[in-house]
Amino acid sequence: MYKKKYPVIIFEGIEASGKSTNINNFSKFLKKNKYQFIKIREPGGTKFSEKLRKIMLSKSNKLDKKTDLLLILASRSENVSKIIYKNYQKKIILIDRFSDSTIAYQHYGMGLNLNIIKNLNSYIIGKFKPDLTSVSYTHLRAHETSYD
C-alpha cells in the first residue's frame, strides 16, 4: 500500500471538544521525532489571515453572516496559495479547522446555502484534498454545562 510521506491532516471539532489539545499533542510528537511539519489554523495562518481572524472574532464587529463566510474563505484562499501549496509534499501539514467547519458553522449554524459554500470552497482549494480529518467529539450536554 502506498503511504504519503507528507500527509495533510485536518483537525475538526466544536469548542471545548479537545481539538486544540489533540493538534498540539500531535505537533509535540512530530517535533520530538524530528518530522518536518507546519501547523496552521483557520481562520488564520498567514499574517493577513490572522488580521481577518481578529476582525471576525472581535465582539465589537457584528458581521453579516455572508461577510463572515467570505472572510473565512478569504483566509482559506491565503492559506492554500501561500502555505499549503508551498509546503505540500514537503512537510506534514496540520490544519486546525477547514472546510467541514465552514459547512457546520455557516450552513448548519447560520443557515447559509450549502451549494454556495461548497462551490466557493471548491473554487478556492482547487484540486487540493486533505488526506485525513480527525474529528474531536464531546457530549453536547457536557459541553453546555462546562460554561455554566
Predicted regions span which residues?
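Extreme N-terminal, non-catalytic leader segments
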Residues: M1-P7
